[in-house]
Amino acid sequence: MTRIPHFGVASFMVCVASFSALTSWATEMGVLAETVLLDPTVQRPSARDLGISPGILRTGQYNAITDVAGVAVGHMTLSKGTRVNTGATAILPHGGNLYRDRVPAGFHQGNGYGKFTGSTQVIELGELETPIILTNTLSVPQGMEAAISWTLKQPGNEDVRSVNAVVGETNDGFLNDIRGRHLRAEDIEKAIVSAKSGPVQQGSVGAGRGTISFGWKGGIGTSSRLLPEELGGFTLGVLVQTNYGGILRVDGAPVGTALDQYFMREVIDKGDADGSIIVIIATDAPLSDRNLKRLASRAMLAIGRTGSPVTNGSGDYIIAFSTHDSVRRGLDKTPSNGLANSQMSPLFQAAVESTEEAILNALFKADTLRGHKGTVEAIDIDAVREILAKDP
C-alpha cells in the first residue's frame, strides 16, 4: 500500500488544487507556448524551433530571464584566433542601485567542485548587493574587481567600504588559453555596463564562449515561464552557463547514446562527464530568501533530466532572486515575508521547466568552435530531429 508522507492534509490539498489549476489553465491555452520564430541573423535553432517545449507552462515574450521586469543581461565576448575564446556575462536584478536596494536571494550547491565567490554572505544574509558575474575559472578575481569597481562608482555609494561581489565560473581551458588570463576587469565591466532587457543572445557568447556540454559545444542559454493568473500571474526566468556532461537526454529521448557520445562510453570509454553548470533564477514573485533557496534547489531536477549524474568534478551552483518591491531590503526598509510555503509548488514547476529548456537552448544555439587545444563540434541538429521523431 502506497503511503502519502504525513505533512498535513491541508497542505496536501493546497498542492493538489494548485497543480489542478495549473494543468487546466495549460490545457485551455493549448498546453504549450507559441513557437518562437528564428532570429533571421542566427542560423542555429532554439529548442522550441525544434518543437521541444518542456512542461506545460507558457513562456514570456522573449522566453528569457529578461521576461522578469527590470532584469538585464550583458555579454562581453573575447575571441582572438583559436587561442583565446572566453568572456563574461552579467545579470542585473534591476536598474537601480543594487547595493542600496538589495534583492533577496537563495543559494543552492549541488556538487561543490568550483568557485562561487560571495556565496557565503548570500547564504548568511539572503540578499544580493551587486550584479551576478559569470566567467571562466581563472578570471574570477577580475570578475570580482569589475563588480566592486562598478558598485563603488554608483551614485550614493561614496562611503561604501565593503562589497560582496558574486561571481560564478566554469572552466573553458580546452577551447581557451585559460592560463593566459586574457580577461581584464575593465573587459568584464563592459558586460555590466552593456546589460539590457529584451532578447538575450545565446550559445557561444559571453561566459559561454569556450564552454563544452555533453561533449558538444555548450554556452549560454535562457528560458522563462508565466504562471496563470489563478496562481499569481508571476514570471520566472532562468539563465545558464553550461560546461558539464553526462548522457544527454533531450525531452526524454536518449540523444547521447543514439549519437554515440556519452560519459563512460569506452570503459564502456574515456568520456568525461566532469564540468560545471551555473544556473541563475529570477522571479517577480514576492519570495523570502528561505523560499528562494528552496526554489534554487529545484533546478537540480532539470540538470538530472538532461542526463547529468552530477559527478565528482562537477561544480553545480544555483542562485535565485526575487525582484518584487515588497521583499527588497534597504538600509531603512523592512521587507515582507512573501508568499506562503503552500504557494511555492507552481514556481517549483516553472523553475524545472525553464532550467531544462535553457540548458537545451545553450546546446542548440552554440556553434562549432576551433579553439586552443582542438575543435568542439556543435550538436547535429538534423540528427537530433531524427532521434526525436523515432522517440516521440
Regions found by a protein language model. Name each.
Residues 1-5:
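N-terminal secretory signal peptides that target proteins for export/translocation
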Residues 10-24:
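Bacterial N-terminal signal peptides
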Residues 6-9, 30:
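Residue-level detector of intrinsically disordered/flexible regions characterized by low predicted structural confidence
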Residues 28-392:
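Alpha/propeptide regions of enzymes that mature by internal proteolysis
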